[in-house]
């Protein structure tokens, strides 16, 4: 339980914050379609990694 609190919560918060900030940067910047598409893929990958981290603990 202690490991869960000390590791899972900070990692989860950091990873989701990174994902959300990445999403905000992508949606606000005027990028061409291909860059935006890559950005969306990165966001999906980011959430996938964060969910995998959650499953690990």
Swiss-Prot record:
Disulfide bonds join 19-39, 26-44, 32-46. Coiled coil: none annotated. Keywords: Antimicrobial, Disulfide bond, Fungicide, Plant defense. One of its GO terms (biological process) is killing of cells of another organism. It comes from the Eukaryota. Belongs to the DEFL family. This is Defensin-like protein 302.
């Amino acid at each position: 339980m202690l490991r869960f609190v000390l590791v899972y919560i900070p990692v989860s918060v950091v990873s989701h914050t990174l994902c959300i900030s990445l999403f905000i940067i992508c949606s606000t910047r005027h990028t061409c379609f291909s860059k935006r598409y890559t950005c969306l893929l990165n966001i999906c990958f980011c959430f996938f990694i964060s969910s995998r981290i959650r499953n690990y603990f």
